[in-house]
Amino acid sequence: MHIKTLTVSQLNRYVKNTLDADFILNNASVKGEISNLKIHSSGHIYFSLKDGGSKINCVMFKSYAYNLKFVPENGMDVVALGNVSVYEKEGSYQLYVKDMKREGIGDLYVAFEKLKEKLKEEGLFDDVHKKEIPKFSKKVGVITSPTGAALKDIINVTKRRNKGIELLIYPALVQGTDASRTLIEGIKILNKVEDVDIIILARGGGSIEELWAFNNEELAYAVYNSKKPIITGVGHETDFTIVDFVSDRRAPTPSAAAEIAVFDREVLINEILNYKYNIKNSMENIIKEKRSYLNLYKQKIEANSPTNIIVNEYKNIDNLKELLNMKIEGKLNKEKNNLSRLSSLLEAHNPLNVLKKGYTLIEDEGNNLITEKESLKKLNKINIIFKDGRAKLSIEYIEEF
């Protein structure tokens, strides 16, 4: 029987193809303890999984590592899901991990979902029960660890946003068997402080075991029954606990919870100044508009007042007088012109003007004009009219031509 000779590369590739074609090895779920852990700067995670008798090399690439819900550590028991394949260059097989969960965590998730569904059915998550978050709190109660980073973050945010806000801190355990009890006590005590306006329930990030105190059923009811509104800021943005669903407002981090509870003094001052400016402008515009209406009505009233009516009538009378004077003057001028024309015409026909040429007029003693000699026969005396006077003459004789 002839045996084909393979190169090392061919052999490794053959083994790789064989493993890649195996259904079980392509969907492997492996339980073991993490060792030789190395989290590379690229984001890839290299480690080994071991049990009492063996170990296997593992790699988890950045795109999968990003979705992990915990930070892997040496000695941690986990269940890794992935596929077995060969790294051809080294000729070694390894587990390419796509997801990983802490051993025993599955039971916690089951308990979490079971309690979540129970409280949801009881109505603890309904929005109708959410209390309104006060916009301008004066005193904020804080329930958290007195030595944790969460408290430092809340204090820093409060100082930055409004130094006038008072923080009343209730020191509580935030993990461990007694943590839920101290958190419940904190809620009860702060509810008795009359001038506390709002409560922050907070802690920093951690694994599901470390945050488990906030998944307690009694704590959930304490949050639900609180007379004062509660903001939860537990863990990081991706961490959700039971109290987050029950609380009146869930913040992704303790710092974000403080941002919600503590109003920004500078922002408020700017808002007040803006309101003041807008009100001032609005009032000025209203006053300006009303003043225009007032002036308009004033003008109408003045126009219709008895004094103005009399003044206007006087003006009308003056105008009529002026018009009448103009018409009279025009009529007089016209008549004067006519008179002058007629005078000229009369003057032109004045018989006395003939006397200026050397002619005379003869009248009887009754001042009747004599134009025929026959009229003289009955007269003894006549009047002779010259251009510059008259004379009385006696008739001595009458001569006929």
UniProtKB/Swiss-Prot annotation:
Its main location: cytoplasm. It is found in: Cytoplasm. GO terms for biological process: DNA catabolic process. GO terms for molecular function: exodeoxyribonuclease VII activity; nucleic acid binding. Keywords: Cytoplasm, Exonuclease, Hydrolase, Nuclease. It catalyses: Exonucleolytic cleavage in either 5'- to 3'- or 3'- to 5'-direction to yield nucleoside 5'-phosphates. Its EC number is 3.1.11.6. InterPro entries: Exonuc_VII_L, Exonuc_VII_lsu_C, OB-fold_nuc-bd_dom. Signal peptide: none annotated. GO terms for cellular component: cytoplasm; exodeoxyribonuclease VII complex. Pfam families: Exonuc_VII_L (PF02601), tRNA_anti_2 (PF13742). Bidirectionally degrades single-stranded DNA into large acid-insoluble oligonucleotides, which are then degraded further into small acid-soluble oligonucleotides. Heterooligomer composed of large and small subunits. Belongs to the XseA family. This is Exodeoxyribonuclease 7 large subunit. It comes from Clostridium botulinum (strain Kyoto / Type A2).
